[in-house]
Amino acid sequence: MMTIQRYSLVFCAIFATCWTASVVNNKQVIDTSVPQTETTLNDADFHSDLHQRYDLQTLGIKVKDDPTIGNYSEGDILLESPKKFVEENNKLGRNAIKQIYRRWPNNEIPYTLSSQYGSYARSVIANAMNEYHTKTCVKFVARDPSKHHDYLWIHPDEGCYSLVGKTGGKQPVSLDSGCIQVGTIVHELMHAVGFFHEQSRQDRDSYIDVVWQNVMNGADDQFEKYNLNVISHLDEPYDYASIMHYGPYAFSGSGKKTLVPKKSGSERMGQRVKFSDIDVRKINKLYNCPGVSGNNNNNNNNQINSNSIVNHPQV
């Protein structure tokens, strides 16, 4: 028995393939004792095996699969309210604000990362960025202060949130310990790329009913719709499986459903596991990505694995 264990340890040391849940600790997620400075990811983060799904709840971390932060517009968008966003953009003459606030130039999104993220969090964030790198032409690049004035500042504030599109300067994206999951990070970064939530579409009432009596007090504005002067559907159908869609219990004040689908194909509504095919196509259309894999119509938009089953969010 000891011989088997010895050989196993040697194999792990040589091939670095034996990352187990037992070696994850809270400081490998976020270590607030570290002075907060701006860093970037390195090659080791992008090639690490540490991103493999880990149950953060075993560390006492409250996981935020579907954040419902009442102080933010639509739960995780850093705006005062959807209405204010529309009013501000009306003042701008409704200038090409279709589905994005501002598009990032050259399909590159510069970023910096808080030094408080540990090795596990860094690998998960890198894996989420890799989803964009392999399926779209959008690239997250380490900020070069000499040429990047506008950039994302990814740090552990309170909850998970992002602004929509490029807003200028040092632009915050918050990923606290409960947000360190690949799907949740992909979702927040998709806001930064330029997308609102799927159920904000003008045509959403043809696909879902909002059960207003089940919505928590003061949260009605979390279900605002944007008209086509503000967002574009990019000629894509409504997507229940989008990583940008709310789950059925979002902002529930009673534990009952707030969103009820009207059509079939909604089994994974609210999933936070991976892009749907339509998500990928929309990003590629928005950024004019040429010949990027993932633009095919292989009719598997709703084929998300069993880990994506949506549970009642903590509200």
UniProtKB/Swiss-Prot annotation:
Residues 95-290 form the Peptidase M12A domain. Its cofactor is Zn(2+). Residues 291-315 are annotated as: Disordered. Keywords: Disulfide bond, Glycoprotein, Hydrolase, Metal-binding, Metalloprotease, Protease, Secreted, Signal, Zinc, Zymogen. The keyword Hydrolase applies. GO terms for molecular function: metalloendopeptidase activity; zinc ion binding. Digestive tract. Found in the pharynx cells of the procorpus, metacorpus, isthmus and terminal bulb, and in the terminal bulb lumen. It is an enzyme of class 3 (hydrolase). Glycans are attached at N71. Binds 1 zinc ion per subunit. It comes from the Eukaryota. Its EC number is 3.4.24.-. Its main location: secreted. InterPro entries: Astacin-like_dom, MetalloPept_cat_dom_sf, Peptidase_M12A, Peptidase_Metallo. The keyword Hydrolase applies. Gene3D superfamilies: Collagenase (Catalytic Domain). GO terms for cellular component: extracellular region. Residues 1-20 form the signal peptide. Disulfide bonds join C137-C289, C160-C179. Zn(2+) binds at H187, H191, H197. GO terms for biological process: proteolysis. Metalloprotease. May be involved in digestion. This is Zinc metalloproteinase nas-4. It comes from Caenorhabditis elegans. The gene is nas-4.
